[in-house]
Amino acid sequence: DFKPSNLRKRMKKAKKATDKARKILKRFDNLDILVCHQPPYGFLDKVSGEYGAPKHWRGKHAGSKVILKYIKEKQPEYVFCGHIHEEKGKAKIGKTEVYNLGMCGWKIVGI
C-alpha cells in the first residue's frame, strides 16, 4: 500500500536507481537490443488504476528519462521493457522498436 510517509524514502531509492542506470548505460555505446525494467519516459508508460496504482499516479507517465535519452542518442534496434503493466504494446522512437511486455510473461518477436 502507498503511504505518503514512505514517499521520501521511495524517491531516494528511485534517484539511486536512476543514477545506477545512467552509469550502466554509459558503458554500452552501440547496443542492438536493450532489455530494461522501465519503459522510456512518454512511451508505453502511462499509469492507470487497473493494477491498484495510487490516485495521484493515475494518468501520469512513469517511464525513465535516462532510458529515453539513451534511445534517442544511440538508437538500438529493439528495446524490451515492462514495469507499467497496463501499457503493454509497441511504440517507435526514431528507428528503435520499443516493446512493453506488460504482464504477458512472454512475447514472440521476429528479429
Where are these regions (language model features)?
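Residue-level signal for functionally critical sites in structured catalytic/ligand-binding pockets
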Residues: D1, L44, G63, C81, ...
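Binuclear metal-dependent phosphoesterase catalytic core
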Residues: K65-Y78, H85-I111
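Short, hydrophobic beta-strand segments that form beta-sheet elements in well-ordered domains
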Residues: L34, Y78-C81
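Short secondary-structure boundary segments
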Residues: Q38, G82-I84
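Active-site-proximal loop/helix segment associated with metal-binding centers of metalloenzymes
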Residues: D1-K60
